[in-house]
Every structure is written in structure tokens, then in C-alpha cells.
């Protein structure tokens, strides 16, 4: 399936969700097509991530003679075509990993040529693991090693958290954001639903890591705890009672239990009659 390889686990599940980032897939066209338009993660900026996918479109000659020049050319072309976008993730695929293309070196060269852009590389070809799970791990660990704490953002609340492992499937991240706003909690970074590249560079500034999908994103939460002392709290937002339990756990951490109970009461009053109909 489109989720069946390690590359897909990195690009389709996590990286490709970001709303302001060019997703450059260094490999044959099929690798890009297979991980495009197969997930429903909308954004509040016109669904940029769902409209576009980029590929170096490797052919046989590039496999034989190397694809680094083609990658460099493709990166410049993408930035030229999307002048408002200054962030990019570059992924290796099976062919480009097998021939040993050095995508990190190419990324450094492009960033030197274009000082206003930032590029993250994910070296996770399909064959590097037995399932998509390997791709989750590679992107999680690569991001915290290379990008976290490379930027600071303004903190506007006394309560801050990272919301990790939620990918805005059918807009759930945006719905949950309304709850955090009502509770007065600032989300430093969404990993990665409706999220931005630069917000993810600020994950070290949060007081709490709330994990919604542990399988895909628990790795970075564990590393944030180990390196920065940020506690990890797991919730399940899929389900009425589960969500209420999650809100209670988060509010207990911040000492705002009354706010949490008020929010839950409002939502119960709104939705319980409709839920009762199904009983």
C-alpha cells in the first residue's frame, strides 16, 4: 500500500503534513505519486500540502551517472516556482540511496546559495526498514538532532505544550485547537497536523508534550523529555469520553482543572442529545 515502506512512513505520515514546506522526493516519479493525495490532512492556508508534490523524476541515466546535480537543479526550480515558500524537506528513496547520492551535501550547497531558505533531509529509503514505522523513527530522531532549538518563538501564555502525533485527518487538529484556545494553552508546535516547519524548531520551549499517536511520534516526545526535561503525557482524542479524559489530564498538569471541567460540560451539553439518539 501507499503506507507500506519506510520512506512512506516518513513522508506520507509525518513530513508531508506540514502546511508550509516543499516536499522534495529524490527518486523516480512513482515514489512521489504514491505518497501524494492519499491522506486527508487539510490545512488553514488553502491545503498547500495536498495540492503539490515535487520529484526529481530520476531516470536510468541518473541512476547510472548519479543524481546529485539533478537534485540540486530540482531544489532551485522548486524554490523559484514557489517564491513564498522558504522551507523544504528532501527524502531519499531506494534508487538514490543505493547509488549513494549525498543529499545532505546538496542541501548545504543550496542553503549556501539561498541564505533565506532552510532544508531538512530525511535519509530513509523504502528498504531501510520492514515497515513504515522505520520512517517515523528516522524523521523523529533526525528532526530533534538537527532542527530543534534552532529557533525561538514568542511565548504568549503561562501554559505551553507541544501537541505531538496528530495529523489533522479530516481537520481534527484544527478542532482540538479550539479547545486549547478556550483553555488558554499555547501550542508551541503541532507535530505535524496543520503545523509549520519553523514552529517545530521551537519544540524545546514547551512545558509539556501531549502525545496523541505514540506509534508514529512517541520517539520525539521521549527525546524531548531526555534532552530538555519536558514531561510526556499520552492521551487519546478519538472518542467523546476519551477526549474528556485527555482534557482532564492536561488541565491537571497545568492546575486548571476548573477550566477543563467547564469546557467538558459545555461540550457534553452540546453533543450529548445527539449521541443519545444513537442509543
Swiss-Prot record:
Keywords: ATP-binding, Iron, Iron-sulfur, Metal-binding, Nitrogen fixation, Nucleotide-binding, Oxidoreductase, Vanadium. Its EC number is 1.18.6.1. Gene3D superfamilies: Nitrogenase MoFe cofactor biosynthesis protein NifE, C-terminal, Nitrogenase molybdenum iron protein domain. InterPro entries: Nase/OxRdtase_comp1 (IPR000510), Nase_asu (IPR005974), Nase_comp1_asu (IPR010143), Nase_comp1_CS (IPR000318). This vanadium-iron protein is part of the nitrogenase complex that catalyzes the key enzymatic reactions in nitrogen fixation. The structure of the 7Fe-V-9S-C-homocitryl cluster is assumed to be analogous to the 7Fe-Mo-9S-C-homocitryl cluster. This is Nitrogenase vanadium-iron protein alpha chain. It comes from Azotobacter salinestris.
